[in-house]
Amino acid sequence: MTPSEPDSVKTRSILTNLSRLAVYDTGIPNRAAASSEVLVLWPSVLADHRIYDAQVADLREHHRLILIDGPGHGASGPSSGRFSMEQCADALSQVLDTLQIVKPVVVIGTSWGGLVAGEFALKHPGRTRAVVMLNTPVFKTRARWRDSFVSWGARWLKFTNRYVQGVADAYFMPETRKRESAFMEGFRKHIRGVSGAALSRAVRSVLLEREDLASRLNSIAAPTLFVAGTHDSMYPVDDLRHAAAQLTRGRFIELPTAHLSVVDAPSETTQAIDSFLTELQLTSSFSSPGAKA
């Protein structure tokens, strides 16, 4: 975690089917109650667990948070080859096994992480309390030049300002980029600091070779919050709204953000997640197929 976070956060390297994954565990909160959940958070490609810093600060008081850096990202090791989102879901399950977490969990994911969350809910329904899919590209689209460039650039151009700035332009609102915060500096350093080969392998697996999830969303049994950004130039909000309508126990929320809502609108995103967690205690709120907020 970031240097400012308490020492109570435990960092582990856990062997999975993909690689050794860096896992950050806030532990059981002092104010744990019957409503406390275990939240598992997986970030987007080209970013690590620090995109959730704002959410961790607010949610850890009442919930146990498990944050996972995907293969080739952050402090995690490289995968041995390309991988599927289902394999990522299996890796998440193996992390829970190692941590001896048996109660159903709330899986929260941004983009790549949202795909993992959806696959986890489909393959491991008994372990899934609920799902939060943030800015998640559920459609299997034809390979676009931009996606191919991002994948290739992750291997060969990641040290250049042009590549890193291009990623930032796609991910964040102009106001976020102009802040020049510690987060933005860390975001750039992360891209430049990890292995280009490992990063490119992961980016290709997610952007170019992911499976279609939109056609299977109606098979997710768990309550699901789907958040999309109005200004997401990568994945149009109307397309994601249409896909989310297939969720049988779904909530759709649109926020005035680009691709990473957790960074562009941290307070609003955290509030949406917190409200969703509160509603989990009232399961009748999700009894109607395709419920919307």
Which residues are covered by each model-predicted region?
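Active-site loop/oxyanion-hole signature of alpha/beta-hydrolase fold enzymes
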Residues: A57, I66-I108
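Conserved HGGG/HGGXW glycine-rich cap/lid loop of the alpha/beta-hydrolase fold
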Residues: S19-G77
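Conserved alpha/beta-hydrolase catalytic His-Asp/Glu region
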Residues: R142-D147, N161-N218
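Short beta-strand/loop motif that positions the catalytic acidic residue
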Residues: I220, F226-A228
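Gly/Ala-rich beta-loop-alpha elbow adjacent to hydrolase catalytic centers
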Residues: G109, G113, A117
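Catalytic histidine-centered segment of alpha/beta-hydrolase-like enzymes
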Residues: T257-T270
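Flexible "cap/lid" loop of the alpha/beta hydrolase fold
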Residues: G118, L122-K123, T128-F159
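Conserved alpha/beta-hydrolase "acid-adjacent" motif
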Residues: S233-D239
